[in-house]
């Protein structure tokens, strides 16, 4: 027994429905199948009872008023009403004609289930058929007569079969067999409605459906695998084509990269020829460290020569973890040139002459403060030109003599006094080391030789002795005025036998002690006597001659004027 049947029985007991009402409720239930013919036949027989008729018709009208999800109540109630009109009492058809408006309203019955199916179409069609039957009296009469004959035949057949078999209950097949033509038609219509409902329901997945689903999945999987293999093959062919194109264009790319590397490499080394006439630097004479490789791939750059004569800097190593090379001895850029190592040639002066054929002797030519050596005059002139200080200066437009070298030679040529070893004449005159005569004819000799056509005799270059850079070389002839030892050391006692010639002392005599009189200060004032101080109302100004007040008229009350004292001796050596 289903749950709906149990619930219906419980309601029947609670509401205390009668036997006729219970049968109508069962025939018009919400079950998915239609009412049985035997049950409808029993209800039709009860319509001849007045009490049962009222109960049956009240329950049918109540079922027709349902709506919504109880659409089966409405449909089965109209099916039962049609059966009762044809096989039941005539009062059934009379009451249905009186309440035809209730049946006509069912033509607009609407209900759509949650699956989207319109279930109200069956109710609307059944309502139209029932209204048409009630309005047509002739058809109603014919249908009623035919249905009653069919019911009688079925009743007789059932009575005969029951008499032959015995008093046993009729089989289910005989109960299900329609007893009349109207009942058969009702059952057929109910079966069609139920079949339509079952056809509209979604089909359940059976074993065949599962097999078809698995087959469809396998086919789709095979198709996907095939497409994947085709795609992989296309990718492989594309990769091979790319690699082949890379190999073909490899040479072109390499040449382009080499051209690009040449653009960013270091420039070519400077030309060996100096455009300003300087000799070519001899790189072999300067020991340099091995050039390190450029970490970015550039060629090694040779270290540039120092134009001031300093040693070439050691190039930085490309290895950041390599220990630094020991630094060489520091070179003073203003000091003397260090002696060249064995096997090294002289370093050329970048500011010197471009004549590289004349050998240079003496100190290294890289020192810019040493005097340039004398060179031969191509016009036959004197190899040395006179200078104002008596030293030999090299001529030429491409070399500039050192402005301090003449003072060095002047310092070495100063005469010394023969009285003592440490005595020097402060204002001693400059002694020319070499002064050509006023009537030197060497230039004329060269000019005559050129006019005749013979080459002028080459002058022998005069070697320049090496000089030592001292503070006196910067001070020149005024170096004797500054005591350099007293500036950096504490002065000691003056020896008793030492004497110096001071031109500022009176008479130019030697000074045996510290000078008392300063020639650059005014003379000290004369000492006044007591009488002069007593007579002077204004104290004398230091450094001014004493003043005396003399009476205009020579009054008798004033004492006679004192004779002036002797004038102070003048000790200024510059005054005559």
Swiss-Prot record:
Which organism is the protein's source? Homo sapiens
- Stretches of Low complexity bias are at 157-167, 265-296, 332-368
Name used for this protein in its record: Epsin-1
One GO MF term on file is: clathrin binding
Localization per Swiss-Prot or TrEMBL? Cytoplasm; Cell membrane; Nucleus; Membrane, Clathrin-coated pit
Task: According to the UniProt record, list the residues that bear Omega-N-methylarginine.
Answer: 534
| UIM domain: residues covered | 183-202, 208-227, 233-252
Biased composition, Pro residues: where in the chain? 297-314, 454-468, 557-570
Q: How does this protein assemble?
A: Monomer. Binds clathrin, ZBTB16/ZNF145 and ITSN1. Binds ubiquitinated proteins. Binds AP2A1 and AP2A2. Interacts with RALBP1 in a complex also containing NUMB and TFAP2A during interphase and mitosis. Interacts with AP2B1. Interacts with UBQLN2. Interacts with REPS2; the interaction is direct. Interacts with EPS15; the interaction is direct. Interacts with ENTREP1.
Please list where the region (8 X 3 AA repeats of [ED]-P-W) is annotated. 274-379
Q: Which domain of life is it from?
A: Eukaryota
CDD domains associated with the record = ENTH_Epsin (cd16990)
Q: Which residues carry this modification: Phosphoserine?
A: 382, 419-420, 435, 447, 454, 473
